[in-house]
Amino acid sequence: MLNTCRVPLTDRKVKEKRAMKQHKAMIVALIVICITAVVAALVTRKDLCEVHIRTGQTEVAVFTAYESE
């Protein structure tokens, strides 16, 4: 009969696995935030070529220039 035993993961490997899970969660969160921003801009604007955001005295303007061939 084959005798097998499980070797516990070292603390380093456990920490690496935890860090990878956190890294993946951060990437997913960033993607969700970006998609939400694009959808919000599409809902409030007709297109994404020009977006202005004003907060108090600060204004952020984003312009996209493109040419179709």
UniProtKB/Swiss-Prot annotation:
GO cellular component: plasma membrane
InterPro entries referenced in this protein's UniProt entry, alphabetically: Hok/gef_toxin (IPR000021), Hok/gef_toxin_CS (IPR018084)
One Pfam family matching this protein: HOK_GEF
Residue ranges crossing the lipid bilayer per the database entry: 24-44
Subcellular location, record wording: Cell inner membrane
Domain of life: Bacteria
Membrane topology category: Single-pass membrane protein
Annotated keywords: Cell inner membrane, Cell membrane, Membrane, Toxin-antitoxin system, Transmembrane, Transmembrane helix
Primary location recorded for the protein, binned into one broad class: membrane
Family from the record: Belongs to the Hok/Gef family.
Role this protein plays: Might be the toxic component of a type I toxin-antitoxin (TA) system. Regulatory peptide which completely overlaps hokC and enables hokC expression.
Protein known as: Regulatory protein MokC
Lineage: Bacteria, Pseudomonadati, Pseudomonadota, Gammaproteobacteria, Enterobacterales
